Amino acid sequence: MEIKEQVVFQARKASKASRKLSGIATDVKNKALAAIAEKLVQAKDEIIRANNIDMERGREKGLSKALLDRLELNEKRIEGMAEGLKELVKLEDPVGEVIKMWKRPNGLQIGQMRVPLGVIGMIYEARPNVTVDAAGLCLKTGNAVILRGGSEAINSNKILARIIEDTAVAAGLPEGCVQLIQTTDRKAVKVLFNLTEYLDVLIPRGGAGLINRVIAEAKVPVIQTGVGNCHVYVDSEADLDMALDIVFNAKTSRPAVCNAAESLLVHRQVADEFLPELYKLFRENNVELRGCENTRAILPGIKKAVDDDWSREYLDYIMAVKIVDSFDKAVEHINTYGTKHSEAIITENYTRAHRFLQEIDAAAVYVNASTRFTDGGQFGLGAEIGISTQKLHARGPMGLEELTTTKYIIFGQGQIRE
């Protein structure tokens, strides 16, 4: 079967499955999720063997340490994915919830009820955990999903998707509810872009290149997620010990994720005291700094930052540093170069903290905390399918409610419109 025919076949199958899935009871969906979690742990050796093939090929291709970390599956991570599915079971099912109801003077009762989006196309890079997370969230919310992961993770994704679909169907969910695009040929993605007859939404999750391509080329509606050129601004009235801890965590805890900080802005009044301490800590942990001219006057051993550095999502142990003359200059820089993801200020000044919250245009804005908390689980929302950086439909971590839409339900007693 040709690539186009195969993808259309899968999309048609998903559309058919979504109609059945939308009406399936919560307890059946929860039973399926629990069974998938159990099966993942049982099959961990098989999963790790498949992942080892991807890891070896990744090393041969010269993938960075950070990207290899995203690709790797081990026993602990597989158990973590299974636990994530078990947590989904505990969460309330939003499907069928009537979020408001009112009565009109003519006696009509009108309500708004949550319903699944339908068929979701998930396009993502070499992160096999997304295969499990996305499938779990879609099944819980009654959505069928077509998964297209990065070629570097193809063997891992194949085994994970097979386990998920086989177990889900055995537990009573419709065939075709979870499918993986098996080919790594990019032609398959182009086909997905145009399947408005079968797909209700595309969710790209990955770097700027992937997301921009989907936005530019897709005819299917897109929810934009996660390019994270995130900033930390150290204000003139910052607690510098706190700032050091936060900047270090935001950059180094997992540099290859979208909520990691990529740029640091430091107020001129504290730069001489703060930057040498930061440089010492980062040098000890093999983090490269790239600075503006004023930064390099204090830290002459670091690389010069060029214009491109202010807008880059490194996803690596690299950070751009700029000294700013004022709070207003920091806000201007962030709103110019940021990607509307996660931005943080470190300050003890109440007025500036609240101005930062109001003036920064981003999905998550922090005062005295690391950007690394932008995550559905960390926000208490449960698992997430991605972090939306757009303003329509959903913004920020996209959990269960964000994978639903609403429809109006109207109860009458024979009313007709005059």
Curated annotation (Swiss-Prot):
CDD domains: ALDH_F18-19_ProA-GPR (cd07079). The keyword Disulfide bond does not apply. It catalyses: L-glutamate 5-semialdehyde + phosphate + NADP(+) = L-glutamyl 5-phosphate + NADPH + H(+). It is an enzyme of class 1 (oxidoreductase). This is Gamma-glutamyl phosphate reductase. The keyword DNA damage does not apply. It is found in: Cytoplasm. One of its GO terms (cellular component) is cytoplasm. The lineage of its organism: Bacteria, Bacillati, Bacillota, Clostridia, Halanaerobiales.
